[in-house]
Design a protein with these regions (language model features):
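Start-of-domain marker
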Residues: 1-39
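Surface-exposed peri-terminal alpha-helical interaction modules
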Residues: 13, 52-57, 71, 143, ...
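Short, solvent-exposed secondary-structure capping/transition elements
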Residues: 13-16, 31-33, 89-94, 205, ...
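A sequence/structural signal for flexible, mid-protein segments enriched
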Residues: 27, 45-47
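Internal, conserved structured core segments that host functional sites
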Residues: 49-111
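Glycine-rich, aromatic-bearing surface loops/beta-hairpins
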Residues: 91-157, 215-234
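A cross-kingdom marker for long, charged
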Residues: 148-235
Length: 235
């Protein structure tokens, strides 16, 4: 996995405003290929840091003694648990729940302050609060099937039975379409597709015409950011 912290502003008080890009990939069975499982940019990371300062995280004392100092360690610990959660989820149905629950504990006990955001429901519709909420909300339980089916029943089977695996991945797109219809504009739907456009195009480029058309229609609807790319490359 990769964590890229990009500083955008600072002050004389050793306080930094930054964005954090989190990337993680999962090995695919019988190949050397790594499939992206997380590719997310968090634009709301404000923290205090003094050169050579030791960074420590205690899950029983998330806020620490200084909220701005602990905001960095809490954010990193949160995403570390989300990475583990999605990784375990892709190998075992609901296997990621223990890590999502740890991430939610961090959210519930997160540092609080005037310059700190991303931990609360009212901080926006796509932030740390909503990501883990979407994965633990029983109303959205189908997302556990989505992750498991996409990776374990789809991607992991591509080498041994490409047609069956592709059909499973198309079924995942249908599940996501149903989810999006019932729960429009949820963070987890957009989150799932980030970093996957090239992979999905390669999967469906060799599909039978009817499956390719259906996949293109669904992808253009579900992954609007890359809609033109799907339309052009999945003809």
């Amino acid at each position: 996995c990769n964590f890229l912290l990009n500083l955008s502003a600072t002050s004389d008080l050793n306080v930094y405003n930054a964005s954090l890009t989190v990337q993680a990939a999962r090995p695919i069975f019988n190949t050397t290929y790594l499939s992206p499982i997380i590719n997310f940019k968090d634009d709301n990371v404000t923290f205090k840091y003094v050169e050579f300062q030791q960074l420590e995280f205690n899950e029983n004392r998330v806020t620490g003694s200084d909220p701005l100092v602990s905001n960095l360690t809490a954010t990193i610990a949160y995403y570390a648990n989300m990475i583990l959660g999605f990784d375990y989820e892709s190998f075992s149905l609901r296997g990621g729940d223990p890590y999502f629950q740890k991430a939610q504990n961090i959210v519930n006990n997160a540092p609080d302050g005037r310059n700190i955001s991303g931990w609360k429901a009212f901080d926006g519709i796509r932030n740390r609060y909503w990501l883990v909420e979407n994965m633990l909300n029983s109303r959205y339980a189908i997302m556990h099937d989505v992750y498991y089916n996409y990776y374990r029943l789809g991607m992991d089977k591509l080498y041994e039975d490409e047609n069956t695996a592709r059909a499973e991945i198309l079924n995942v797109l249908n599940l996501l379409n149903n989810f999006n219809t019932d729960n429009p504009n949820k963070m987890i739907n957009q989150f799932f597709f980030q970093g996957k456009s090239t992979e999905l195009i390669k999967i469906f480029a060799k599909a039978p015409p009817q499956d390719k058309i259906r996949a293109s229609e669904l992808l253009q609807k579900l992954d609007i950011t890359n809609a033109a790319k799907y339309k052009d490359e999945l003809k």
